[in-house]
Design a protein with these regions (language model features):
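N-terminal pre-catalytic "stem/leader" segment of glycosyltransferase-like enzymes
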Residues: 2-47
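Conserved aromatic-histidine-acidic binding/catalytic patches
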Residues: 2-7, 85, 147-155, 205-212
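Short, conserved catalytic/metal-binding motifs centered on acidic residues
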Residues: 11, 92, 217
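Non-transmembrane alpha-helical segments in soluble domains
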Residues: 16-20, 94, 98, 160-164, ...
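Residue-level marker of structural boundaries
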Residues: 24, 105-106, 226
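PAPS-dependent sulfotransferase catalytic domain
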Residues: 29, 36-201, 238-239, 275-276, ...
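PAPS-dependent sulfotransferases, especially Golgi type II membrane carbohydrate sulfotransferases
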Residues: 183-291
Length: 291
């Protein structure tokens, strides 16, 4: 069982479209029951647990892959499902932080940024998604023990080729079209952002505050970039550069990429509606910390 830890603003939505097309009805965008979800609406603290996974398995016979914002390697899935194999993508912490701010803040004045960057729940997001607490050393320990593959948003195409080799899934389709792009959104908050001068994000003061808010994330990211990712590249059995170019050629000529109709229908018309009425089991909203 593969489990994708979807960390916000790391190109995870694009990767999820790849997993949907590659695994079909053996893939589930796993979600929490509505009542459980509301307890962690802001920082997504609740974890997918064994009951959530069992519920998905009952609806998805042959389930081989799950993905979601609430999939966490510290949340107990590994003890309930010893064969589960976690993977994720990380992104440069400052770039990811700014992207999340621009996507979620709602108001984009300098004062709004001051409030955002002062809110501890926004700090060290990637570290907390891995470890449940803003401690890079703990996240590194969990990665060493439980997370078997980590891609990098900054090396997305190369990471997709490496991921395909690691998954060893015959139906893997690495071609993609980027989704959930900020420039394509037209929510009221996006119109507000477009009307606001966000040049303050490029000032030395803002960069310093962002760095301070993501100090543990930076330690984690540096560890992955210098220790984990190079090992994955070294272990690749083929000519990685050539295979990346082949993926890029296929991307340019692929046209529109459609998810198979039946998995999309099942996810939207069967699985999601069922979650409105599902009762949460153990409340894991207190697992880990949100600081």
């Amino acid at each position: 069982m593969y489990a994708f830890i979807h960390i916000e603003k790391t190109a995870g939505s694009t990767l999820t479209t790849i997993l949907r097309r590659s695994f079909g009805t053996r893939h589930c965008d796993i979600r929490l029951p509505l009542a459980k979800r509301r307890r962690g609406e802001r920082d997504r603290r609740p974890c997918v647990d064994a009951d959530d996974l069992q519920r998905a398995q009952r609806l998805y016979p042959g389930l081989s892959c799950i993905a979601g914002h609430n999939v966490k390697p510290y949340g107990g899935l590994a003890s309930s499902w010893p064969d589960i194999r976690f993977f994720t993508f990380l992104r440069d912490p400052a770039a990811r932080y700014i992207s999340q701010y621009l996507n979620r803040a709602g108001v984009y004045t300098r004062e709004a940024f001051d409030s955002w960057v002062s809110s501890r729940w926004t700090h060290n997001w990637q570290t907390k998604k891995i470890a449940g607490v803003p401690e890079a050393d703990r996240a590194i320990e969990i990665i060493r023990q439980r997370v078997e593959f980590i891609g990098l948003t900054e090396r997305f195409d190369e990471s997709l080729v490496l991921l395909g080799q690691w998954l060893a899934e015959p139906g893997y389709k690495g071609e993609y079209r980027r989704v959930n792009q900020l420039k394509e959104k037209s929510r009221p908050r996006d119109l507000e952002r477009e009307r606001t001068d966000t040049g303050y994000l490029d000032t030395d003061d803002s960069r310093q505050r962002i760095a301070e808010a993501n100090a543990e994330d930076q330690k984690l990211y540096d560890f992955v970039v210098t220790q984990i990712y190079p090992r994955q590249v070294e272990a690749y059995p083929g000519d990685l550069a050539v295979d990346v170019r082949h993926l890029q050629v296929r991307n340019r000529s692929a046209g529109r990429l459609y998810e198979p109709l039946w998995p999309a229908f099942y996810r939207n018309c069967v699985y999601k509606p069922m979650l409105r009425f599902a009762e949460p089991s153990v409340d894991l909203s207190t697992t880990g910390e949100s600081r």
